[in-house]
Amino acid sequence: MKGDSEMVEETIMLQSIDDVKSFATIANKKKYDVDIVSGKYLINAKSIMGIFSLDLTHPLNVVAYNDGDDNFLEEIDRFIYRPEENK
């Protein structure tokens, strides 16, 4: 599904088990691919076990291959990493 779709990237923080479950639920509702990149690892964001295999103490990069007509960023807004707010 990564062919002609628009790529959206954002940095997120998942700070609890509930955050991971909520994020994976949002990703699973999407018909397009959603990946999380952490260092050299790329995992399917629809996989709760995959997310838990990552180091969740650091921000994660999310890449969604949507059609450009979607509210994915609005849905994950509460997870978006904003370092200026964490000071």
Language-model-detected regions and their locations in the chain:
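Positively charged, low-complexity intrinsically disordered leader regions
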Residues: 7-15
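Short, Lys/Arg-enriched N-terminal segments with co-localized hydrophobic residues
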Residues: 1-6
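A short, aromatic/hydrophobic, helix- or strand-capping loop or linear motif
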Residues: 36-39, 87
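Conserved beta-strand core positions
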Residues: 10, 32-34, 60
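Amphipathic alpha-helical interaction surfaces in cytosolic regulatory modules
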Residues: 17-33, 41-56
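Short glycine-rich, basic-tinged beta-strand/loop micro-motifs
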Residues: 7, 57-58
